[in-house]
Amino acid sequence: MNDFTLNAELRSDLGKGASRRLRRLASLVPAVVYGGDKAPESISMLAKEVAKLLENEASYSHIIELNVGGTKQNVIIKALQRHPAKGHVLHADFVRVVAGQKLTAIVPVHFIGEEAPIKKGGEVSHVTSELEVSCLPKDLPEFIEVDVSALEIGSIVHLSDVKAPKGVEFVALAHGNDLAIANVHAPRVVKDEDEEAAEGAAE
């Protein structure tokens, strides 16, 4: 049994106006499902069920069993459009998962070993919190682990430094883009008002 499931219904009332009515009157989230050998489907889901699913970070990079009017299909989240102020989901895109066929997905990054550079007086900055990967459905990782324990002040972790799980390829690297993932820098020194006043008086 899939740990991540979502119920949906087909919708025929399309367009921006229809989507707004769904959200306002029925507390539904409009979405589209595409990919595989089937035609795209416009669907709607209960907003509260979508919110509950997304409470688990793993749902963003996990195969979801989508039940559309009694017909089940495996999908992954491709894109989410959120309200700019409130943060709730306004629209979702799902891509069908086909066994034996590679997919691309956005996977969260988990950083470990941050205590070591901090003890050396550094501060760790996360340049990115997620990565796009390409793999077969069976190899889709829940997250990508990045170890920063060996970093010194001034060091940077690039995507090429990160070990990809077996069967997984980083899309950015495949396109020649060696992204910065994290860096360690010296803490910024902020002078307080008394110090600045004393320096001003000395001048």
UniProtKB/Swiss-Prot annotation:
Q: What's the protein called, per UniProt?
A: Large ribosomal subunit protein bL25
Give a short account of what the protein does.
Answer: This is one of the proteins that binds to the 5S RNA in the ribosome where it forms part of the central protuberance.
Q: Which InterPro entries match?
A: Rbsml_bL25/Gln-tRNA_synth_N, Ribosomal_bL25/Gln-tRNA_synth, Ribosomal_bL25_b-dom, Ribosomal_bL25_C, Ribosomal_bL25_long, Ribosomal_L25_dom, Ribosomal_uL5_bac-type
- Record keywords, A-Z: Ribonucleoprotein, Ribosomal protein, RNA-binding, rRNA-binding
Organism, scientific name: Pseudomonas syringae pv. tomato (strain ATCC BAA-871 / DC3000)
Listed GO biological process terms: translation
Query: How would you summarize the oligomeric state and partners of this protein?
Result: Part of the 50S ribosomal subunit; part of the 5S rRNA/L5/L18/L25 subcomplex. Contacts the 5S rRNA. Binds to the 5S rRNA independently of L5 and L18.
GO molecular-function annotation terms? 5S rRNA binding; structural constituent of ribosome
